A protein has these predicted regions:
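Active-site helix of classical SDR
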Residues: 125, 161, 169
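Alpha-helical segment proximal to the catalytic Tyr-Lys
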Residues: 130, 174-178, 235
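Substrate-binding pocket helix/loop in short-chain dehydrogenase/reductase
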Residues: 101-102, 109-114, 196, 207
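Conserved glycine-rich cofactor-binding loop
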Residues: 11, 18-19, 42
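C-terminal substrate-recognition "lid" of short-chain dehydrogenase/reductases
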Residues: 84, 122, 133, 137, ...
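The beta1-alpha1 cofactor-binding region of Rossmann-like NAD(H)/NADP(H)-dependent oxidoreductases
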Residues: 43, 64-76, 107, 220
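Residue(s) in the substrate-gating loop at a strand-loop-helix junction
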Residues: 145
Length: 250
């Protein structure tokens, strides 16, 4: 018997959905029947992501967008509405790292990470929130990080931004509940991505030793939690952060 596609008919935006965790999320939601819009700065990666999603039988669209620019956020929302008529789920996934010790960190390293990882979430949540308020329904899922809960040396910018995402999730979850808009966060730990692959082997091994499950997580394991939050089974969950980290932070 064919398994029912529980997200059939729903329209999803995944920012930064052209690579890494974002692409894993877009892929799984497409497999589950959703129409998926992915955004990112790299046009070639966007095209490749759209082709992959369409190969799964999903209506898909790639929109070049810079997460730090209000006009790009507004355009992404408008293009999605023009193509699909509504927005049911927003996954705020776009993010960057600019790691450095606190005393050596440049102003630009701080500003770029906060702009992309926190301001970008605010801009997209505000833009999509207006649409969902008119619909009187919606799901917003923010990709946070274990770093936002526990802090990471060499990542004061990233940790601060992701802690801000967790706070934004709590506040907007309470504020938007009146319109039946549920806002939650998923906080991954060490996940197999391009970012993780760039970590020096010695540092990567040291991080892995802190994970009780003694392995690196996979993007699909994060995506499965996003799918839950996007679906009907999470209809009484809002303002929460679900950690996917192999026990790194509990």
């Amino acid at each position: 018997m064919t398994e029912a596609k529980t997200l059939a008919g729903r329209v999803v935006i995944v920012t930064g959905g052209n690579r890494g965790i974002g692409l894993a999320i877009a892929r799984l939601l497409a497999e589950d029947g959703a129409s998926v819009v992915v955004s990112g700065r790299d046009a070639a990666r966007l095209d490749a992501a759209v082709k992959e999603l369409e190969s799964l039988g999903a209506p898909a669209l790639g929109v070049p967008a810079d997460a730090t620019k209000r006009e790009d956020a507004d355009r992404l929302v408008e293009v999605t509405r023009e193509r699909f008529g509504r927005i049911d789920v927003l996954v705020n996934n776009a993010g960057i790292t600019r790691d450095q010790l606190l005393v050596r960190m440049k102003d630009d390293d701080w500003d770029q990470v906060l702009d992309t990882n926190l301001r970008g979430v605010f801009l997209m949540t505000r833009a999509v929130g207006k649409v969902m308020m008119r619909q009187k329904s919606g799901r917003i899922i923010n990709i946070a990080s274990a770093a936002g809960a526990m802090g990471n040396p060499g990542q004061v910018n990233y940790s601060a931004a992701k802690a801000g995402v967790i706070g934004l999730t709590k506040a907007s979850g309470r504020e938007l509940a009146h319109w039946n808009i549920l806002v939650n966060a998923v906080a991954p730990g060490l996940i197999e991505t391009d970012m993780a692959a760039a970590i020096p082997a010695e540092a990567r091994e040291a991080m892995l030793q802190q994970v009780p499950l003694k392995r690196i997580g996979q993007g699909r394991e994060v995506a499965e939690v996003v799918r839950f939050l996007a679906g009907d089974g999470a209809s009484y969950v809002t303002g929460q952060t679900i950690h996917v980290n192999g026990g790194l932070y509990v």
